């Protein structure tokens, strides 16, 4: 993890390569963590594996992250819930939208189409979308 995700820049669009690579690695590792569960007809276990991986890796980043779109409300999801704070609490503040495993049924049935997703923006720039 670099000293700064921006170097001398303050705009998210100017994020450095190290920061970009960290985000790519987070989604890759979340996707790979699902591999042992492919085709086992248990979408809950597959989703838990991806969520655990993504949360663990987000918490290693030098950011103050706020999940604005996640796995559900705090009382419905144990991790990556809306409002959860992630990162080391050092560095710039971000809003984060995640879906560690989009297409849980595809993964459970070993079908193509499941993906791991993360979107990140400067604080207060992502629409906070609690599920209704």
Regions found by a protein language model. Name each.
Residues 4-97:
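N-terminal subdomain of lithium-sensitive/metallo-dependent phosphomonoesterases centered on the IMPase/IPPase/PAP
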């Amino acid at each position: 993890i670099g000293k700064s995700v921006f170097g001398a820049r303050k705009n998210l669009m100017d994020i450095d390569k190290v920061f970009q690579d960290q985000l790519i690695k987070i989604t890759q590792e979340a996707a790979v963590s699902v591999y042992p569960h492919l085709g086992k007809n248990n979408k809950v276990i597959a989703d838990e594996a991806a969520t655990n991986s993504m949360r663990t890796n987000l918490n290693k980043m030098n950011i103050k992250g706020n999940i604005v779109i996640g796995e559900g409300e705090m009382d419905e999801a144990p991790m990556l819930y809306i409002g959860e704070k992630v990162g080391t609490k050092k560095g710039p503040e971000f809003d984060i939208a995640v879906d560690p495993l989009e297409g849980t049924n595809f993964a459970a049935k070993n079908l193509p189409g499941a993906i791991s997703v993360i979107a990140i923006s400067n604080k207060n720039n992502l629409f906070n979308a609690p599920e209704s």
